[in-house]
Curated annotation (Swiss-Prot):
Family: Belongs to the BI1 family.
Molecular function terms, GO-annotated: calcium channel activity
Tissue specificity annotation: Ubiquitous.
Gene encoding the protein: BI1
CDD domains: BI-1
Protein name in the entry: Bax inhibitor 1
Organism: Oryza sativa subsp. japonica (Rice)
Amino acid sequence: MDAFYSTSSAYGAAASGWGYDSLKNFRQISPAVQSHLKLVYLTLCVALAASAVGAYLHVALNIGGMLTMLGCVGSIAWLFSVPVFEERKRFGILLAAALLEGASVGPLIKLAVDFDSSILVTAFVGTAIAFGCFTCAAIVAKRREYLYLGGLLSSGLSILLWLQFAASIFGHSTGSFMFEVYFGLLIFLGYMVYDTQEIIERAHHGDMDYIKHALTLFTDFVAVLVRILVIMLKNASDKSEEKKRKKRS
């Protein structure tokens, strides 16, 4: 999904039609853009609900895997190919993509539920709080300085993808895997801020595609949630192993 994220980000940048001049525009958020943001976040909430349904379906029916991931990527590609004015169709495709993404993350969700269900709740709440804080920071900022993070974040994402590719070929240790997780978490937390301000700037330039913008934020949210969940599971597993060792000794 990280690979497709970089593809979708590049697609959006090419289609937006705005350049360096937009970075120097520090206008306050207009009422029209505020209404657009409300629609974006409402759509995001619905997509997250659909993703939760997908995760539940995996826990109940064990449907998540490579097929659902490919289906999710295919759905997102289909979404980009549908004209913007076909809102109902694109909204339905977004929900299908979110559901398939939830099913794809389902194995990790099930692992967390089987180990300790409180970890899942804590990870989701932590992600929601982080998302809310970083989003608010991006919205209330008077200057759009966070847009300048785009090049740095893109470079970081490229490094992350390269590390994952190298690990798939040469293998990796637990230490290198956790480095990828923490590094990826840092990158996608940055994207939460960057994407929010980019959405605002695009809206100021007439891009009111709330479905595409909701998809961008949905991808950020899931990427952060997965990494926080992995970190919490690893820490909980280490503590459990340590307790077992103490009992044996």
